[in-house]
Amino acid sequence: MKSLWIAIIITLITSQVVSARRKEPEDPNYPKDPNELIRTKWNAVISVLQNKEIDQEARIKKINKIVSPIFDFQLMAKLALGREHWPKLTKQQQEKFIQLFVERLRTSYREKIALYTNEEILFKPAEKKKSTINIPMELKTKDKKIAVLHKLRKVDKRWKVYDVEIQGVSILLTYRSQFDDILSRGTVEDLLSRLEEPPPQ
């Protein structure tokens, strides 16, 4: 069940591929409070997951529309690759890495979203940092509780998610360790080629 929720969260994160940050149009309905932002988006996603009258393709499209505005994809790509490696990439390589990285996550996990079975969500108050905010959440299944932590920062006056921890483990840092291993033995082009390969089953 833990792997299911990891799959759902990563599906949310990878719901839209972008190559570079661009200023977004004003949205008067975009929540200014980060607690409200996370709560509103999760409730909307759960509503879609619980709707058995729509097929999987329609479900994914609806989730894309709900959550795609709230993630800082450019920062997520930088953090996943790491400060040591990111500046070494050309602009073209950076854009390609973002696309391949997000597509890899999407391909690996989004099929599992269909396994959702009405687990309970408990939202918790935000933990304020100097320039960021952490918002914890607990997912209750029949036999366990799963701790989820959303990490947010402000981008163009909007709160955006830049990482998610599950049971204390950062999704981005997990990928960084894999990328570090590849780059320690090869080049950036080797990494991009690996990301173009189908993910292991």
Report residues per predicted region.
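N-terminal export/membrane-targeting signals
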Residues: 1-19
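Boundary of Sec targeting at the N-terminus
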Residues: 20-26
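Early exported N-terminus immediately downstream of N-terminal targeting peptides
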Residues: 28-109
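Surface-exposed aromatic
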Residues: 86, 135, 161
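A mature extracytoplasmic/lumenal domain signature
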Residues: 101, 125-127, 139-141, 152-154, ...
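Surface-exposed, charged secondary-structure patches
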Residues: 107-146, 198-201
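Short beta-strand edge/turn micro-motifs at domain boundaries
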Residues: 145-173
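Low-complexity, intrinsically disordered terminal/linker segments enriched in charged
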Residues: 163-201
